[in-house]
């Protein structure tokens, strides 16, 4: 894409402001022209009225002067002509023309009055003569009529001069305004360039928030969202580095055990010892496989949940399916496994919720001794679906209850060497992604451990995930 085709805030602001200035200038010019023309026409019309009234008064005076004498109409006309010609209004570039009538007979007229001009009646009218328009005024008094005409070209010329002297300074100011607009836009967008320069200097290891103290209010929201994104990236990268480091450390032990058992099996000449070695190799491989599966699951859970994949899930049915898969493990250890469920729906993803229930029940079966009990309850509360997994095993000491949600943590009192230390961290993350909370308590008969999961319940036909509440993802210990 060419540079000119790339959207530019600066270019858009400049164009909008400059076009706005030009449109405002044209609007002011048009309004000024209209108002000035109206005012000028009124002033010129008033001049024509004053001229006509003055001419009629002079004619009346000339008639009175000759009334007591034996004067002819010709003398009256000549005296009137001399008086009218002396009026100031006739000295302005011969703009006005006039004609004097008495009882329908012409008495005198000016040389600049076209013969084809005729008044349309008393008052003002506009007529066309000699290819131009004329303003004509007819006044009547005592049998006399006077026509005063004015070529509108003179008015237009006067109007053009007035408009030129009024608007030309504004026209000269347009380039200055354009320069000020350009400077103002460039200065106003300077914070964007500063933010751009700061972001360009960032590396993959430098994900600290951008300072917002000097950021204008208009882009502070953008910077806040960018800082949130940087924080999420920093958290994700730290979690990935921590997971990689912890996984490398945790997988070293089962790999060493696998190597040892394989070497023993290879060196042993006793068939029974050889078989025992291969069995240990198989168990080590299974443990490594389980560990890797949980590491991969936890890595996927470190990303945000895809809310568009959420749908109503029957938690009671899901728990029943999980228990049917783990029944053999309970039978092998002679553990009484029971389920008490109420139908309740939660909004979520089946596979993740199944992994959550499976990890909780699997942990209970793993750490409960032979002949023990594991109880699962699914309860339908007013606003929540509650999952309870209780056992009568050794439990977890109070000072360790917060630590068991840490990745790869295994309690010294309960560790059998089989767990990966990822089960409860996976459960907690799944609960957080489903807008729920998790807590710990006493198990069956006042001993062992109870894990409580609270999830927002929904309707079977719901289509939207629940809103995140204030306690979402919080552990209640």
From Swiss-Prot:
SUPFAM superfamilies: ATPase domain of HSP90 chaperone/DNA topoisomerase II/histidine kinase, Homodimeric domain of signal transducing histidine kinase
Keyword flag Kinase: yes
Pfam family, one: HisKA
Enzyme class: transferase
GO BP: phosphorelay signal transduction system
Domain named HAMP: residues: 186-238
Transmembrane segments: 13-33, 161-181
InterPro entries: HAMP_dom (IPR003660), HATPase_C_sf (IPR036890), His_kinase_dom (IPR005467), HisK_dim/P_dom (IPR003661), HisK_dim/P_sf (IPR036097), Sig_transdc_His_kin-like_C (IPR004358), TCS_sensor_his_kinase (IPR050428)
Reaction catalysis annotation: ATP + protein L-histidine = ADP + protein N-phospho-L-histidine
Residue span(s) of domain Histidine kinase: 246-459
Induction: By cationic antimicrobial peptides and by Mg(2+)-limiting conditions.
Matches recorded under CDD domains: HATPase_BasS-like (cd16940), HisKA (cd00082)
GO molecular function: ATP binding; phosphorelay sensor kinase activity
Region of interest: Disordered: 455-477
This enzyme's EC code(s): 2.7.13.3
Keywords per UniProt: ATP-binding, Kinase, Membrane, Nucleotide-binding, Phosphoprotein, Transferase, Transmembrane, Transmembrane helix, Two-component regulatory system
GO CC term, one of those recorded: plasma membrane
Membrane topology qualifier: Multi-pass membrane protein
Gene3D superfamilies: 1.10.287.130, Histidine kinase-like ATPase, C-terminal domain
Residues recorded with modification Phosphohistidine: 249
Annotated localization: Membrane
Function: Member of the two-component regulatory system PmrA/PmrB that plays a role in the regulation of resistance towards polymyxin B and cationic antimicrobial peptides in response to limiting concentrations of Mg(2+). Also autoregulates its own pmrAB operon under Mg(2+)-limiting conditions. May function as a membrane-associated protein kinase that phosphorylates PmrA in response to environmental signals leading to activation of specific gene promoters.
PANTHER family: SENSOR HISTIDINE KINASE YKOH, SENSOR PROTEIN QSEC
Record protein name field: Sensor protein kinase PmrB
Species of provenance: Pseudomonas aeruginosa (strain ATCC 15692 / DSM 22644 / CIP 104116 / JCM 14847 / LMG 12228 / 1C / PRS 101 / PAO1)
């Amino acid at each position: 894409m060419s540079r000119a085709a790339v959207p530019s805030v600066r270019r858009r602001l400049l164009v909008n402001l400059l076009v706005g200035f030009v449109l405002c200038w044209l609007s002011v010019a048009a309004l000024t022209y209209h108002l000035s023309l109206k005012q000028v026409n009124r002033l010129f019309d008033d001049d024509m009225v004053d001229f006509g009234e003055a001419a009629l008064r002079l004619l009346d005076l000339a008639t009175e002067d000759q009334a007591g004498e034996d004067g002819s109409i010709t003398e009256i006309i000549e005296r009137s002509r001399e008086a009218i010609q002396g009026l100031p209004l006739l000295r302005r570039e011969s703009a006005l023309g006039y004609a004097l009538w008495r009882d329908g007979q012409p008495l005198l007229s000016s040389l600049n009055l076209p013969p084809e001009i005729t008044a349309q009646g008393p008052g003002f009218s506009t007529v066309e003569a000699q290819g131009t328009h004329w303003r004509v005024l007819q006044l009547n008094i005592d049998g006399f009529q006077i026509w005063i005409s004015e070529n509108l070209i003179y008015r237009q010329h006067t109007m053009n001069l007035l408009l030129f002297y009024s608007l030309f300074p504004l026209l000269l100011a347009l380039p200055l305004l354009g320069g000020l607009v350009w400077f103002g836009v460039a200065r106003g967008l300077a914070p964007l360039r500063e933010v751009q320069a700061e972001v360009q200097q960032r590396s993959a290891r430098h994900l600290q928030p951008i300072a917002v103290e000097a950021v204008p209010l208009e882009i502070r929201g953008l910077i806040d969202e960018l800082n949130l994104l940087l924080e999420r990236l920093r958290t994700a990268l730290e979690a990935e580095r921590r997971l990689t480091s912890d996984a490398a450390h945790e997988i070293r032990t089962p790999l060493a055990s696998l190597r040892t058992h394989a070497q023993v099996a290879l060196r042993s000449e006793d068939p029974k010892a050889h078989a025992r070695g291969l069995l240990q190799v198989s168990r080590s491989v299974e443990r490594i496989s389980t560990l890797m599966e949980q590491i991969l699951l936890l890595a996927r859970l470190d990303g945000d949940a895809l809310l568009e994949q959420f749908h109503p899930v029957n938690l009671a049915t899901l728990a029943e399916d999980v228990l049917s898969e783990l029944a053999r493990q309970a039978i092998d250890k002679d553990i009484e496994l029971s389920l008490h469920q109420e139908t309740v729906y939660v909004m979520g993803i089946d596979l993740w919720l199944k992994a959550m229930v499976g990890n909780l029940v699997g942990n209970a079966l793993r750490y409960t001794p032979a002949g023990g009990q594991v109880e699962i309850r699914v309860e339908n509360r007013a606003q929540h679906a509650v999952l309870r997994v209780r056992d009568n095993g050794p439990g977890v000491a109070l000072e360790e209850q917060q630590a068991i949600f840490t990745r790869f943590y295994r309690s010294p009192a309960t560790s059998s060497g089989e767990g990966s230390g990822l089960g409860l961290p996976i459960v907690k993350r799944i609960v957080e992604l489903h807008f729920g909370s998790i807590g710990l308590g006493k198990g069956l008969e006042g001993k062992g451990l109870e894990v409580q999961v609270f999830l927002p319940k929904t309707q079977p036909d719901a289509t939207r995930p629940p809103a995140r509440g204030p306690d979402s993802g919080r552990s209640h210990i």
